Amino acid sequence: MVFLMMYVGLSIFVGDFYTVPLSVAFVLSSVWGVATTARLPLTERLKVFSRGAANSDVIYMVWIFILAGAFAMLAQKVGATEATVNLTLSVLPAGYLMPGLFLAACFISMAVGTSVGTVVALTPVAMGIAGEIGGSIPMFVAVVVGGSFFGDNLSFISDTTIAATRSQGCSMRDKFNVNIWLTVPAALVILAIYFVIGGSVETQVATESVDWQLIMPYLLVIVLAVVGLNVLLVLLIGIVAAFVVGLTYADTDALSMLGFMGEGVDSMGNLIVVTLLASGMLGLIQHNGGISFLIDRMSRGIKGKRGAQTMISLLVAVVNMCTANNTIAIITVGGLARQISEKYGLDSRKTASLLDTCSCVAQCFIPYGAQVLMAASLAGISTVSILPHLYYPFALGLMVALSIIFQFPKRYH
């Protein structure tokens, strides 16, 4: 709450939601959190905050940010990004660029099982395409972010799918069968919207001849990600490939490329700071019983199946907004969701689907979520500028609401 008050308050004060640094709002709210944590000396309070920031999942994400920054900057400087953009522009007419990017993000995230890996692979390409045709960079980046959550929500190897199905005691296949009733209609509607928006794009960009050698780093990253290789290993291989391409085909020396990698790592500094501060705040919130308090208060007064499903959806969404991690949110709420599900006779497969889907929707609309932060950092834009263009999560949230109101799919009620 303090963070939201700080961020919204400062934004209103300066009259611009796009210029207020997230890091400042997190620093102020973190100081408040440490100061108001009771019954502990200051040193112990700082240790609680630091343990939250040093969570293994968070540090793993930091390593991804570092390697992603190095790869993105190196690929850009050696010409790999420009070559990939030229290939895309030569293959797809202007009206098909948005739908093509969205489908690519959906497919890659479905194969990889992670939205972050998809964002890392496609955001520089989306940014380059927008720049070439004079399109909105936040809009094109949002297409990638939205599509990345399609697969994250459906994939059998996604950590959110695994967490949701295990917590509810159902199979991943059954949860998938429920999810497609929500995700596929939403994706088709948004795909149609992108065709309409793309059809209005009028551009006569003269694409240069495609330099296939320069495309290899991005092609390698996408193929290895689809194969299912660990994202850190994929990025390392991508960096090596970009380095080799730079030495062999680009007019670049090794020392310059090391400098480019350093620039890329430096560009991720703000993202890493925000991630650590947000995780430290979560540590304080959990220590002070904030998550338990939210769950206890929100789970009271449930009436009927629709009320139970609505409460499960809201619970996981609110906890996700506090933790900025959809997997942790599902794990935190999963046990209580199963109790509610059994008490009100809900189908465990539908409950697992609601947990996964609503956590993904909530993750899209917080400016400090890993996916939006990563995309904004790679594109050099504000996180807030991306949020209004996230059409797919809006549509997915609407499908969840309709599925609760009209109780579909009937087989899973």
Task: Please place each PLM-identified region on the residue numbering.
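Hydrophobic alpha-helical transmembrane segments of multi-pass integral membrane proteins
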Residues: V62-F71, P93-V125, M298-R338, L355
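Juxtamembrane and boundary regions of transmembrane helices in multi-pass small-molecule transporters
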Residues: F13, F17, G146-F149, N153-E208, ...
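Alpha-helical transmembrane segments of multi-pass membrane proteins
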Residues: I64, G95-I108, G134-G151, G307-N320, ...
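Hydrophobic mid-bilayer segments of alpha-helices in multi-pass membrane transport proteins
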Residues: M1-Y7, Y18-A38, M61-L67, L122, ...
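Interfacial loop-to-helix junctions that mark the boundaries of transmembrane helices
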Residues: I12-A25, G52-S56, T88-P93, N177, ...
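Re-entrant/interfacial helical elements at transmembrane boundaries that shape
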Residues: G117-G128, V145, F156-C170, F293-L294, ...
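Membrane-interfacial loop-to-helix junctions in multi-pass transporters
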Residues: N55-M61, N86-A104, A130-F140, E208-M216, ...
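Core transmembrane alpha-helical segments of multi-pass membrane transporters/permeases
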Residues: S23, V27, A35, L46-G79, ...
